[in-house]
Amino acid sequence: MNTRFLLLLCCLSFTTFSQPFDAIKQPNRSEEEVTQLAEDFKDWSKASNGWRYSFITANEKEAVEDFSISGYQTANDYLRATDTSTWGVAGADARQYIRTVKSALNKLPKYKGTAYRGTWVKLSLLNKLEEGDVLVEPAFTSTSTLPEVAKRFSVVHPNSPQRLKRVLFEVKINQGGHTIAGLSEYSKEAEVLFAPNAHFRITQIERTSNHTYIGVETVKASAVKNTQKYNLYSGEEVEASFWHSLVCT
C-alpha cells in the first residue's frame, strides 16, 4: 500500500482507538509530517469528488478559494450580526456570496470522521455548558483533520471586551462536513467546512486552567427539539422561535 495513503489513514483515524482529547493534547508532530498529511488529505479530497462536482461552476470555485483567504470574514460577520438592516449594498453582496459558497459545498466531497477546531469562547457560555447541550453556530464553521492546525487558531487572544477562554473542540462528524482542501488556497489546513447553522451536541467537557476541551458530535436540527441550545457565538440561549427560523432558512 502507498506510504502516503497509510499516513493519511493514520491522520483520519488518529482518535479511533484513543481516549477523548488524546490527539489534541499530544505534542505537535513535525512541520514536515503535518505538511505531508495535509497534502495527502488534499489528494484524497480531489480523488473523492463525486458526480455533483461536475456541476460546480467557476464562480463557485472562486468563492471557495476566496473564502479561505478573506471571504470568511465578511460572510461570518454578516451571519453573526444581530441587525443586518444597515449593511445596504454590502449586505446584498454578502447574501449572494454566502449562497454561492453554500451551493459549492453541496458539490464538494463529504467528510465523516474526526476533526478539530481551536477558538475562543465567551466564559459566560462555558460556565453554563453541560454534556448533552447543543451548540448552534450561525456562521460557517471551519475545522481541520489535523489537531496541530486547529491549535494554531487559538494561540492569539482576540481583541474583545468580553471575557474569553481558549477552547479546543474535538468534532465527531456524522453529517454536514465537506472538505474544501481540494480548492482552498490554504490546502495545508486540511479543512472541513460546515454550512451556517450547524448543530453540535456536547458529548464531553474537560475544563483546565488554560483550556477547555469540548467533545461534540454533529446532529440534525430536527433531532434536538427538546434540548438546551446555545448560540456558540453570542452565548445566548436559542429560543424555540429562533431555533425554528434557523431550521427553515
Curated annotation (Swiss-Prot):
Keywords: Glycosyltransferase, NAD, NADP, Nucleotide-binding, Nucleotidyltransferase, Secreted, Signal, Toxin, Transferase, Virulence. It catalyses: L-arginyl-[protein] + NAD(+) = N(omega)-(ADP-D-ribosyl)-L-arginyl-[protein] + nicotinamide + H(+). This is Putative NAD(+)--arginine ADP-ribosyltransferase Vis. Its EC number is 2.4.2.31. Changing E191A: Restores 40% growth in yeast. The active site is at R117, S142, E191. Belongs to the Arg-specific ADP-ribosyltransferase family. Its main location: secreted. GO terms for molecular function: NAD+-protein-arginine ADP-ribosyltransferase activity; nucleotide binding; nucleotidyltransferase activity; toxin activity. InterPro entries: ADP-ribosyltransferase. A probable mono(ADP-ribosyl)transferase, it may ADP-ribosylate Arg in target protein(s). Upon expression in yeast cells causes cell death. NAD(+) binds at residues 68-80, 117-120, 137, 191. Residues 1-18 form the signal peptide. Transmembrane segments: none annotated. GO terms for cellular component: extracellular region. Residues 31-223 form the TR mART core domain. The keyword NAD applies. It is found in: Secreted.
